[in-house]
Amino acid sequence: MKPFPRAEISAQALKNNLSRLRQIAPNSSVMAVVKANGYGHGLLNVASCLTEADGFGLARLEEALALRAGGVKAKLVLLEGFFRQVDLTTLVEHGIDTVIHNEVQLDMLENASLSKPVTVWLKLDSGMHRLGFTPEQFAQVYARLEACPQVAKPINIMSHFACADEPDNPMTQEQLQVFEALTKNSKGYRTLANSAGTLYWPDSQADWIRPGIALYGVSPVIGDLGRNHGLEPAMKLVSQLIAVREHKAGQPVGYGCFWHAKADTRLGVVAIGYGDGYPRNAPEGTPVWVNGRRVPVVGRVSMDMLTVDLGIDAKDSIGDDVVLWGKELPVEEVAEHIGTIAYELVTKLTPRVAVCLD
């Protein structure tokens, strides 16, 4: 018997999405971003499906070590870098690359005693103003890294887009110009394109692309769908009906009793709630998929359950599957109804949701 709720992860979709991104950026290596537990799809699940990726991008050292322990031998890059000097020894021991984005990291690196040099990616702040060295600092920091015996040569360079998911925003072109001007003569690898850069800004693809959400079949752009780019949803979030109830016109349902039926209907109670990561703020009308059709959420989402209006003529039964998002119902659309982004939905599932590789 399959558990519920569960997130069914399609290995074939992950592989197909990687292949599709290679078609879109044929001259670039692929750094598959698998931070946040593989965007909620399971870190080792995703890595086991993306063995053809050239490397993996992660946010935490613990994530990188989990991949090494799981037998992953590909290039691993810590996108936020290291936080303690002692971590440098671990990076060298396990062959993990690190981003350098601030003066403290640079000082720790220069004062470290390492058995061999560590591979670094110098982070340029090309306009996002979150991490990285400014264009004015860039040449001096680059020279310090060149002179540092603890740093493997050549030095790689990275930056990150602020607005690439807004295709008409001129900021992306400005960042691209800054990046090109400062890095065009560099000897190491260069990487700038995230998912949105890869899909919408081909001039940004450089030596490496860093797709995250696109690998999972989701578009990074509000109002767009991954399938418009030949991508397939990798996650299907499924639960079941645990009750089907006759409901009279005027009767409320759920905490607060703020929703009342306008006519006689049948309500279905679904075994999923905010305790599983489904948003409590999902408004009336948020769609779910039951037996080949969309039906709306009604009433307030509770910790373990939500309620849907199946309609007066519904033939649905207890035990029937309910798809919260997946191929039938794109997560991008669900996110738009709720007023959030698909990234948040897929990464906020709690451990109560069984993640099953298909």
Swiss-Prot record:
The active site is at residues 35, 255. Keywords: Isomerase, Pyridoxal phosphate. Its EC number is 5.1.1.1. GO terms for biological process: D-alanine biosynthetic process. Substrate binds at residues 130, 303. Catalyzes the interconversion of L-alanine and D-alanine. May also act on other amino acids. Belongs to the alanine racemase family. PANTHER family: ALANINE RACEMASE (PTHR30511), ALANINE RACEMASE, BIOSYNTHETIC (PTHR30511:SF4). This is Alanine racemase. It comes from Shewanella woodyi (strain ATCC 51908 / MS32). The gene is alr.
